[in-house]
Amino acid sequence: MMGVQICQGMMSEIPFFSPPPQFSYMMNKNIRLHTDSNIRNTFFTDIGIGISANSLLLLFNIFKLTRGQRSRLTDLPIGLLSLINLLMLLMAAFIATDTFISWKGWDDIICKFLVYLYRTFRGLSLCTSCLLSVLQAIILSPRSSCLAKFKHKPPHHISCAILSLSVLYMFIGSHLLVSIIATPNLTTNDFIHVTQSCSILPMSYLMQCMFSTLLAIRDVFLISLMVLSTWYMVALLCRHRKQTRHLQGTSLSPKASPEQRATRSILMLMSLFVLMSVFDSIVCSSRTMYLNDPISYSIQLFMVHIYATVSPFVFIVTEKHIVNFLRSVCEGDECLNIH
């Protein structure tokens, strides 16, 4: 039973996917999803909020770059994460139209293009979040730490790492360019549905297990790296607080430094990511145990995009320099002339 769940876990990377054993049951539910206006409206509202928030965060990083302000080591990954989440949500919105809206459908090229890009952006979002956590741990590390030597690395090193990971993830998901097709016949049981128009060619149990194992190794490695870097940052913050109280007295509460505020925002982001990953795994397992219950299916549709929707708000709310920068832009353009 555990082996079946692991092999089926591969398809949780693709939205609206139904594992083969419950194909007929889930297919009928998918066809009728467009008639449920509550699920459709809630889903697109969630996607719309995420697109708006990530667009705002991306614009801030672009303005900061064009104005020549001093950038931090984490600025590039934060801007990249907002861009990746923005593109992923746009792909999810396009894919959702083929599930929630009844229409003529797509051809092979559109199916391959949308599902492949969505899969790639989801992987890059995970990778960039991990990179962001590690970089913040490097920034916070003391001079005596072995991580301190990475603090002054040129920005192009980060760009090369991101580019290499992008190529790697594009290669990992390249099998979708072959296996994803336009559904030739809605009544056949030979294809596994992704949406109403798109299906994935059936794979052997061995191939499913192989891809599932590779994806599981990737996810476990990156999430473990995030957890370790998060634990390291928490330990450093606790030690810093104890030292500050010892030197200045417990009656004083010194203002948090920009590095500490940035670290707290990263900690919030990583905690959210880990919680959403665990919750998504639980819901995915419940779908397998309870024959793809439509309630669990609907919950997974929303939960899979919560991180991409909420993450920009974490930076916007906790990063004081974002508010100050936007305020300075408005003052420069005389948009705050309130008498």
Curated annotation (Swiss-Prot):
Membrane topology (UniProt): Multi-pass membrane protein
Gene3D superfamilies on file: Rhodopsin 7-helix transmembrane proteins (1.20.1070.10)
Annotated Pfam families: V1R (PF03402)
Keyword terms, alphabetized: Cell membrane, Disulfide bond, G-protein coupled receptor, Glycoprotein, Membrane, Pheromone response, Receptor, Transducer, Transmembrane, Transmembrane helix
Endpoints of the signal sequence: none
Function: Putative pheromone receptor implicated in the regulation of social as well as reproductive behavior.
Protein name per Swiss-Prot or TrEMBL: Vomeronasal type-1 receptor A14
Classification of source organism: Eukaryota, Metazoa, Chordata, Craniata, Vertebrata
Encoding gene, per UniProt annotation: V1ra14
